[in-house]
Swiss-Prot record:
Protein name from the UniProt record: Glutamyl-tRNA(Gln) amidotransferase subunit D
Superkingdom of origin organism: Archaea
First-tier enzyme category under EC: ligase
HAMAP family linked: GatD
Native source organism of the sequence: Methanococcus maripaludis (strain C5 / ATCC BAA-1333)
Self-association and partners: Heterodimer of GatD and GatE.
Keywords: ATP-binding, Ligase, Nucleotide-binding, Protein biosynthesis
NCBIfam families: asnASE_I (TIGR00519), gatD_arch (TIGR02153), PRK04183.1 (NF003217)
GO MF annotations in UniProt: asparaginase activity; ATP binding; glutaminyl-tRNA synthase (glutamine-hydrolyzing) activity
Family classification: Belongs to the asparaginase 1 family. GatD subfamily.
Catalysed transformations (reactions): L-glutamyl-tRNA(Gln) + L-glutamine + ATP + H2O = L-glutaminyl-tRNA(Gln) + L-glutamate + ADP + phosphate + H(+)
Active site: 84, 160-161, 237
Gene3D superfamilies: 2.30.30.520, 3.40.50.40, L-asparaginase, N-terminal domain
GO biological process: amino acid metabolic process; regulation of translational fidelity; translation
Name of the coding gene: gatD
Length: 418
């Protein structure tokens, strides 16, 4: 039984048929079924193997493309951190492989040749749930290198689970005149419903626009009509599987992009770039990693806060209830944090809306204990911002800056139509 063979595998009480795929575990057989889904089976539990059709061993070597630069098009660098958005499929085995040479990208999405001169580079190849602050720094360094080498726009292919964390981190870390677009895919490129190709087409188009800042680009609705460009500090993944999982929160998207006709329609004001400074990049990648994000719930114990304080944490972001509250039984832990110079700040777990700790006595008492209200900041954004502040400023200055807008993370007022 070799990769590419179509087989029938009999277990104790069921039978599976499909194409044998590469497996990372020698004790597991992975097959792709006709439904398009993969299944991994323990070799020890397989009672009988029947090869229904022999397949050719997959060959991944491809002749090079003649990719001449078009002087009329902008130079866009696509950086990969992992994820499925820019992978390619071996159609003999059904296996999905990273596609991050420029040749691979053009083969996977040939429409890119009409939009920009493409350069592909792998930074990381990880599942996004394994993202670390150290990897944010690596990504920022790679962005700086590409811009200094002539990139006029950056696209970052990223797994969707933590993409909004990375977008927030890069917003605080990177100051540049070029657009930095994070893009992902909710459906793998081996599925008919994949959103990968349209998302990357729209992302590259966005990267050619005369704008600056960090953005997230994903499907704007469940069909294949438009993609939305979201501000990097005002976006969140709000559905586990829908293709339009990413939404702007407390704000409208920056733009709507039609990937078929390559049309960008701006929905609100955007930061325009200064072309005279296009190669200038300033990085600030200093982070205090001893910051925690805690969700408040009925019965939450002060011992949780004490644990973080006793283990050297410098900052705590609370996802409070409603307008920014905790149970009174949690006040003891907040006092303990304050006594030990651990900065505590408050967001709301409602996601939409803003913290207002002046309405009820609970909120006012929390403020008296030193808790900083985070206005309409998303919890994940506040988490990253506090890491950034404590990595660069002292305790008192960090407290002062926490509730002030730095890179678009706070709105003075909320659009009620959002």
């Amino acid at each position: 039984m070799d990769i590419g063979d179509f087989v029938k595998l009999e277990l104790e009480n069921t039978t599976y048929s499909g194409t044998v795929m590469p497996s990372l575990n020698e004790d597991t057989v992975v097959i792709k079924m006709k439904s398009g889904y993969n299944v991994g089976l323990d070799k020890k539990k397989i009672k009988n193997i029947e090869i229904l059709e022999s397949g050719d061993k997959p060959k991944y070597g491809l002749p090079p493309l003649n990719l001449e630069k078009n002087p009329k098009l902008k130079n866009i660098s696509i950086l990969s951190t992992g994820g499925t958005v820019a992978s390619r499929v071996d159609y003999k085995t059904g296996a999905v492989h990273p596609a991050f040479t420029a040749d691979d990208l053009i083969r996977a999405v040939p429409e890119l040749m009409d939009i920009a001169n493409i350069k592909g580079k792998v930074i990381l190849n990880i599942l996004s749930e394994n993202m670390l602050p150290a990897y944010w720094k690596m990504t920022a360094d790679a962005i700086k290198e590409e811009i200094e080498n002539g990139a006029e726009g950056i696209v970052i292919a990223h797994g969707t689970d933590t993409m909004h964390y990375t977008a927030s981190a890069l917003s605080f870390m990177v100051t540049s005149e070029v657009p930095i677009i994070l893009v992902g895919a909710q459906r793998s490129s081996d599925r008919p419903s994949s959103d990968a190709a349209l998302n990357i087409i729209a992302a590259v188009k966005a990267a050619t626009e005369p704008i600056k800042g960090v953005y997230v680009l994903m499907h704007g609705e469940t069909g294949d009509t438009v993609c939305h460009l979201h501000e990097g500090t005002k976006v969140r993944k709000l559905h586990s599987s829908r293709r339009d999982a990413f939404k702007s929160v407390n704000e409208t998207p920056i733009a709507e992009i039609n990937p078929f006709i390559k049309k960008v329609t701006y929905l609100r004001d955007v930061k325009s770039q200064d072309k005279s400074k296009i190669k200038e990049v300033v990085l600030n990648t200093d982070l205090e990693e001893k910051v925690a994000l805690i969700k408040v719930y009925p019965g939450i114990d002060s011992e949780i806060l004490k644990f973080y304080v006793d283990n050297g944490y410098k900052g705590i972001i609370l996802e409070g209830t409603g307008l920014g509250h905790t149970p009174e039984t949690f006040f003891e832990g907040i006092d303990y944090a304050n006594e030990n110079n651990v900065l505590v700040a408050m967001t709301t777990q409602t996601i939409n809306g803003r913290v207002n700790m002046n309405v009820y006595s609970n909120g006012r008492e929390l403020q008296a204990k030193g808790v900083i209200p985070c206005e309409d900041m998303l919890p994940e954004v506040a988490f990253v911002k506090l890491m950034h502040l404590l990595g660069n400023y002292g305790f008192e200055e960090s407290k002062e800056l926490m509730s002030k807008n730095i890179v678009g993370e706070i709105n003075e007022s909320i659009n009620l139509e959002c």
